Amino acid sequence: MSVKEHLIHNVHKEEHGHAHNKITVVGVGAVGMACAISILMKDLADELALVDVVEDKLRGEMLDLQHGSLFLRTPKIVSGKDYSVTANSKLVIITAGARQQEGESRLNLVQRNVNIFKFIIPNVVKHSPDCKLLVVSNPVDIWTYVAWKISGFPKHRVIGSGCNLDSARFRYLMGERLGIHSLSCHGWIVGEHGDSSVPVWSGVNVAGVSLKALHPELGTDADKEHWKEVHKQVVDSAYEVIKLKGYTSWAIGLSVADLAETVMKNLRRVHPISTMVKGMYGIKDDVFLSVPCVLGYHGITDVVMMTLKSEEEEKLRKSADTLWGIQKELQF
């Protein structure tokens, strides 16, 4: 008899069924691994699968996490180049994509990434036909559209991480100004993730007290307190971090884990995330932009219709036109 047979008396023969709360992360770069560790620390999955094309790095990352299993509550961490390892995932997080090369046009980069997504998405769909797709790769609004087109999934199951992080950065910076924790500072950034995002100043509040009511110039050029700078800092923050450390990872990883928690626990929290906005705010094309969405186990179930000023709506439409200009040139 083996040590195991001497030690353990079997009472019930378990059938090896599949995991009930499986999450997959596609891409084990800095962002993918920040997502992975943030999800593991929140105990959101009973199985975590990692996928990448770089096999040595992939296996190394898996082993490194497995060796920390004692300190985690996720019993199974697996990896593989073959997408069969992702089978029966409830949530699949896409962080993979090509980086822009020197002198390369944005459209050329976008087209190269379309070709990568044409490999990733069908493989994900084949092995997890009922999953929710959470797209993180940038430019996230375009990739969410591409993932939706290629997957054939209904729009509520294809989600972009969108402005969830922009809004978190905004609330952090607002809290720094006021000396209050960011959880108690409320403000929404919507629209395109990144440079042309739209801060909704009318909704900025602490304990239900509107800052705009206290200070009508809030967010305008006439504002002597320069609150507009807070939004500029949000837009510039990723560039600053990239300049200093070469990439962003921790904040986006934490933001993605926040979204994953809402999905896996069916919390029905409202997040500023990228969804199909055709028919909203006068937008006529198939584009994905961030608006406040009710998120849960089935994906995005509802959109909260914000009361936007005419110039805010105009900014959203302008972003939509820019995105559509790129999207309509893509070859699927």
UniProtKB/Swiss-Prot annotation:
Which molecular function terms from Gene Ontology are attached?
L-lactate dehydrogenase activity
UniProt-annotated binding residues for NAD(+):
29-57, 99, 138
Q: Where in the cell is it found?
A: Cytoplasm
Q: Which UniProt keywords apply?
A: Cytoplasm, NAD, Oxidoreductase
Q: Where is the active site?
A: H193
Q: Which domain of life is it from?
A: Eukaryota
The disulfide bridges present are none
Functional pathway = Fermentation; pyruvate fermentation to lactate; (S)-lactate from pyruvate: step 1/1
Q: How does it assemble?
A: Homotetramer.
HAMAP family attached to this UniProt entry: Lactate_dehydrog
Family per similarity comment: Belongs to the LDH/MDH superfamily. LDH family.
Q: Give the function comment from the record.
A: Interconverts simultaneously and stereospecifically pyruvate and lactate with concomitant interconversion of NADH and NAD(+).
Q: What is the name listed in the Swiss-Prot or TrEMBL entry for this protein?
A: L-lactate dehydrogenase A chain
Which organism is this protein's natural source?
Alligator mississippiensis (American alligator)
- Lineage start: Eukaryota, Metazoa, Chordata, Craniata, Vertebrata
